[in-house]
Amino acid sequence: MMKTNGMDIGLVSAILPDRTLEEVVGFAAGRGFDCVEIMCWPVGKAERRYAGVTHIDIDRLDEHATEGIRQMLQRHGMRISGLGYYPNPLDPDESKSELFIGHICNLIRAADRLGVPVVNTFVGRDPSRNVDDNLRVFAEKWPPIVKLAEAHNIRIGIENCPMYFTNDEWPGGKNLATTPAIWDRLFEIIPSPAFGLNYDPSHMVWQMMDPIQPVLDYAHRFHHVHLKDAHVDRERLKRVGIMATPLEYHSPRIPGRGDVDWKAFFEALDRVGYKGDACLEVEDKDFEGSSLDVERAIDMALVHIRSFVPTKS
């Protein structure tokens, strides 16, 4: 018997880009979510799908705005699980790297003001350089970010998405924190408990890795969890092989429509005593025809998730 009532289920706000913060929070509350991960990109044009969403503009987050957000959350009986911003902090263009890191640092300060415990992001990567070269740059750029997080009592959750899907990210992808072997090296460089993972099992599926074992091995580093599924088209994979760009053989799916064994996943979280937040992330193209399709995807996924993690009584 699972005892997952210690875990809260939330919604990643990126799938509702055209709604206001209060509309997102109200929608999530009405659907039966416990919390929300709020996207906090700088205001501007998105460079990729699901990016560039600004539900909180932290550049305008003064004391009055902060108090307004607190009161709004209280009205809806909701809270924010984490502030999300997913750029490439190790971008080879130094001006971009500095801009991205600067916003992450501002996000840490904003999380402190809002009383939000986690900032979720990517480590980043120069896709044209190998892992060792990128680790050297990581060792230069990331320790000051984590020191700032420690000073503000904020945890950083690094998502394990390789950010490699098409030729646009070829050959290495735009995020270094992709596998347990690399996580170990990142944690050797930055052993701080403030630096951990925003774990998404779907990314292990299409890398042909076990999505359950990391729960057992790295639970102490789990600061946040994303609930997303993925389906690997085995017939297509037979034709294109693992050297193809990943979207040639796999598709992101809502939980229950892909290859993740969600019963085993939640049992593993239960076994390790995870009591953090797990937020549904919707990136399923089969449900992008209209806002009603998006809502249907959210509802279907939540029904599946709640079969393992019931609503708290």
PLM regions and their residue ranges:
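Histidine-acidic metal/acid-base catalytic patches
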Residues: 1-34, 42, 74, 115, ...
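Short histidine/acidic/glycine/proline-rich micro-motifs that form metal-
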Residues: 15-16, 55-57, 86-91, 125-128, ...
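Residues that cap or flank secondary-structure elements
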Residues: 15-16, 60-61, 99, 136-137, ...
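Active-site acidic/histidine proton-transfer and metal-coordination neighborhood
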Residues: 23, 67-79, 89-199, 206-207, ...
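Conserved beta-strand positions in the central sheet of alpha/beta enzyme cores
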Residues: 37, 82-84, 120, 157, ...
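Glycine-rich, proline-tolerant flexible connector loops at the mouths of alpha/beta enzymes
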Residues: 39-68, 129
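Flexible loop residues that form catalytic
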Residues: 41, 88, 124, 161, ...
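Short, basic/glycine-rich phosphate-binding loops at helix/coil junctions
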Residues: 80-84, 244-246
